[in-house]
């Protein structure tokens, strides 16, 4: 029997290590390639003569230039063969409910509006050279106009008859935020057992540390809304709001602003350093993301959800911190950038039905139902959400205060604070979340805060090397609104239009 000497054993180990490293490297590349980049689509009218063919060609060239520049915006999802339409999960939920011509028109109008909005940011972020190649005369303004005009022209031609409308309906889909191949390669059924155990432990800890009373002996900084609004005027807005043919409320910009001012929270953060101050995301001169804490802002997103055969208005308030500081080099949760989304779901009378918080990574989701909601005895999710008590308050008389602990920015307290006696605090203005989709990048260029995967560059966490079998792309990384998976076990999204029906029943309690 031949016994390998020490030198041969070392050589074999080295070769084995190289093979393992190559396999792991190929696996990482493969898994990264499975992530969900925006998928531009081409109109079937490409190559036609006349205005329709010209417009189809225009969208194809615009998408090509946007892709080459790396500025494709991933907030919404494309509709195959209809480059002038995009869809989110809420709009996609009406796919089987638009037989009526008026409903179909309202539905397609909303999809076109999403596309026009996204393309405006993409055009803003295009390098000047690319813009000049697309429209050397009118520049970006000419491109905005052409997006609108060509979208109108193609939509009118594409949907004259019932059959093409049905064809489009079948192609409308909002992809989920889970990569199936990762779950296969990561032996998800086994991995999910360990993840479920960790989630259960976090739920227990979060329950025991949560309170609807103010924190005691905290050294904290408070931020209060810069502007106030009148409760009765807000109730009037909600009571008289018009609806489109889908039943979705339609608010003017001024009405939206009044709603956001009315329900804006007080932010209270236990402070130990600059990482506990909120601010404005910026691109630095070195081309990296940071948060300027000298300019505290709260970003707003208007959304809608479907509950008990109603369409409810949701107000999202998003803040950003410079970091979640690491406790050590091996801290898998710490890193650059952190943030929180606080959401209020309103009843038709303006009374909040549900408060929610989730970190901007999609992590640490918490629901705080008001008395008019009853938690279902069995919530039909593989990973049940954490449901906590909501404070009992009158929004006309009280702010909701969202109190977070230092460093982790976990929400530890949700409590009422009288509007007549505002605390010593720093005032914050509200800003449209869309601003983050096109930020100043250099002296002339602009860039979204988020890359084409919907992630904030530089916000990656070490936990992504542990939790990749869950199928979530870059767990712990900060994400663009509309791209938040909020569970590691099963599938659940922050903007799921039917999540409230799966979690709650409506009661008559006022």
Label every PLM stretch briefly.
Residues 23-28:
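Sec-dependent N-terminal signal peptides
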Residues 277-355:
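Short N-terminal edge-element motif at the start of the domain
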Residues 4-22:
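Bacterial N-terminal signal peptides that target proteins for export
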Residues 219-292:
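Charged, compositionally biased non-catalytic regions
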Residues 37-234, 336-338, 349-510:
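Domain-length functional cores that host ligand/cofactor binding and catalytic or interaction surfaces
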Residues 3, 36-37:
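Short, aromatic- and cysteine-enriched interfacial helices/patches
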Residues 32-33:
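C-terminal motif of bacterial Sec signal peptides marking the signal peptidase cleavage site
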């Amino acid at each position: 029997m031949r016994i390998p000497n020490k030198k041969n054993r070392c050589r074999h180990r080295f070769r084995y290590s190289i093979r393992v490293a190559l396999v792991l490297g190929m696996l990482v590349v493969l898994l990264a390639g499975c992530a969900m980049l925006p998928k531009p689509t081409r109109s079937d009218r490409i190559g036609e003569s006349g205005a329709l063919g010209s417009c189809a060609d225009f969208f194809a060239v615009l998408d090509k230039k946007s892709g080459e520049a790396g500025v494709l915006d991933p907030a919404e999802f494309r509709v195959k063969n209809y480059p002038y339409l995009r869809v989110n999960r809420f709009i996609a939920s009406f796919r089987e409910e638009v037989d009526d011509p008026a409903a179909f028109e309202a539905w397609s109008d909303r999809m076109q509006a999403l596309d026009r909005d996204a393309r405006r940011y993409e055009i803003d972020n295009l390098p000047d050279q690319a813009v000049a190649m697309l429209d050397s005369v009118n520049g970006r303004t000419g491109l905005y106009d052409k997006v609108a005009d060509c979208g109108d022209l193609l939509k009118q031609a594409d949907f004259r008859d019932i059959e093409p409308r049905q064809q489009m309906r079948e192609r409308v889909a909002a992809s989920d935020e889970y990569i199936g191949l990762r779950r296969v390669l990561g032996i998800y059924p086994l991995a999910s057992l360990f993840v479920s155990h960790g989630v259960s432990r976090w739920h227990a800890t979060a329950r025991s540390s949560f309170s609807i009373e103010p924190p005691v002996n905290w050294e904290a900084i408070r931020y209060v809304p810069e502007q106030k609004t009148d409760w009765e005027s807000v109730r009037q807005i909600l009571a008289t709001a018009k609806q489109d043919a889908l039943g979705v409320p339609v608010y003017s910009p001024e009405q939206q602003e009044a709603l956001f001012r009315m329900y804006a929270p007080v932010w209270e953060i236990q402070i130990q350093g600059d990482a506990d101050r909120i601010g404005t995301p910026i691109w630095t001169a070195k081309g990296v993301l940071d948060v300027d804490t000298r300019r505290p802002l709260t970003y707003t997103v208007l959304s809608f959800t479907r509950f008990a055969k109603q369409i409810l208005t949701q107000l999202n308030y998003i803040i950003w911190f410079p970091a979640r500081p690491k406790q050590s080099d091996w801290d898998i949760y710490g890193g650059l950038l952190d943030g929180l989304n606080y959401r209020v779901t309103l009843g038709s009378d303006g009374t909040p039905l549900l408060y929610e918080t989730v970190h901007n990574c999609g992590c640490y989701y918490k629901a705080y139902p008001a008395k008019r909601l009853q938690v279902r005895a069995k919530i039909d999710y593989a990973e049940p959400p954490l449901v906590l008590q909501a404070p009992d308050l009158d929004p006309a008389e009280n702010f909701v205060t969202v109190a977070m602990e230092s460093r982790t920015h976990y929400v530890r307290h949700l409590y009422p604070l009288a509007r007549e006696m505002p605390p010593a605090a720093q005032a914050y203005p509200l800003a449209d979340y869309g601003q983050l989709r096109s930020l100043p990048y250099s002296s002339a260029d602009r860039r979204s805060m988020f890359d084409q995967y919907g992630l904030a560059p530089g916000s990656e966490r070490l936990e992504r090397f542990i939790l990749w079998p869950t199928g979530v792309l870059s767990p712990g990384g900060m994400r663009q609104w509309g791209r938040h998976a909020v569970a590691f076990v099963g599938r659940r999204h922050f903007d799921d239009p039917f999540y409230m029906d799966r979690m709650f029943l409506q009661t008559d309690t006022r």
